[in-house]
Amino acid sequence: MRLRKCVPRRRSVSWTRFVPGRSRSQGAHQKDKTAARTAPTGLSGLRVVDFSSMFMGPYCSMMLAQWGADVIKVEPPHGDVVRYLGDERNTGMGPIFLNANRGKRSISLDLKRSESSEVLRPLLGKADVVIHNFRPAVEASLRLRGTDVLAHNPQVVCCAFRGFGTSGPYAGRPAYDDIIQAASGMASVQGNGGPPEYVRTVAADKIVGIMGLAAILGALVERASTGSGQLVEVPMFETMASFMLMEQQGGWIFDPPEGADGYVRTASPHRHPYPTKDGYLSVMIYTDAHWRAFFEMVGRTELIDDPRYCSMRERTRNIDELYALVAAELVGRTTGQWQADMEARDIPSMPVNSITDLFRDPHLEAVDFFERVNDRTHGAMRYARAPVIVGKAPSELRPTPSIGQHSLEIARELGLSQRRIGHLTQVGAIGSQATEGLV
């Protein structure tokens, strides 16, 4: 599938608002739902073509959609495999997919068929951003390498999520969240001296997705100055190694090392939510003022000037003793009693929420964190809104699309005739839910 070079006529969108010093001010979250429907959002006018699947790329493009970008999800005829994970009301619309792909449009293309290039060429030509997580051999076979895409559209930002950087010996290896948690040291740290353990969420996928978002926005800032696009590679392994080493490198920042790796406080076996009389409480007694207030609160004022605990350096050296002391104190009273006393003394603390507790959290309720919608296909639903609002008001997002829900709409926008769309649908190059009136 060859792509002819296409230098698109740029839409009248000024991306100088991303240049430092020229940014629009970020508005507060607006409760006025009418304003939310009509006000422009930070990325309005940005077109994103997203070939990625699973978690990492879709999480990145979901955030772009939440900030107002027009995200077009390109799916194979069978759809993204994540569609089929978890409980569902309708086939192919599982909860993870619903969350990660809200606000996007879906076009179904069989990229292995040469005819699909009739849609792919203009789609890439009108894109501001292209996202994919193809392995190098696959992107080469589909002619979707960064060089291919940039040759076709020199102004596009092409974000390629990789398992491993392409210049190293691991290039081209398959990678998933578990693999990268293991390779990056995250699983080892979770094991805390025992058998390694995975973090019980797709941490690497989501962290790398956020790094991809930052890389895309940085490339758009540069494009605002130069007018040129670029290939941005976001490797999972290198990203997570950097993420872990920030505080875990320890004495190994020196060459030769001046001590052990790791961060003593986070490695303490006593660092965990503390049992109370009726549950658990997370407490972060950190500064000199925090510890003084805590010792006074529990009647241990003799420890305030104890040389083992009078400075952050010494407390870190004796952190196991301190955490054990806190644990022994907290077990005697209820979570609510402790939290009230700690809040009065400005000591950071929070009860331990389950996932379902979040839906009843009074703070999240007060900030309208959950958007409740009545979807005509799925019925009543609730979504977590964007935690950060860019622009004057949050956008009202499209519902999560079914496979190829917008194929015909997008093909028409790209200038294909009704007859040609009908032919491409008949031969299987385009997949769509609607075929009426195409031939």
Where in this protein do the model-derived segments appear?
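Mid-to-C-terminal alpha-helical segments outside catalytic/metal-binding sites
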Residues: 2-18
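N-terminal helix-loop segment corresponding to the beta1-alpha1 unit
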Residues: 18-225, 402, 408-439
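Glycine-rich beta-alpha junction loops
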Residues: 78, 163-165, 236-241, 278-280, ...
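Conserved Rossmann-fold dehydrogenase catalytic segment
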Residues: 166, 193-203, 224-240, 260-266, ...
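Mid-domain beta-loop-alpha active-site segment that forms a flexible
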Residues: 202-217, 236-244, 286, 290
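Oxidoreductase and adenylate-handling cofactor-binding alpha/beta cores
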Residues: 209-229, 242-252, 295-301
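Aromatic-enriched alpha-helical interface/lid elements that frame and gate functional surfaces
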Residues: 269-345, 349
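A glycine-rich dinucleotide-binding beta-alpha-beta segment and adjacent secondary-structure elements
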Residues: 344-397
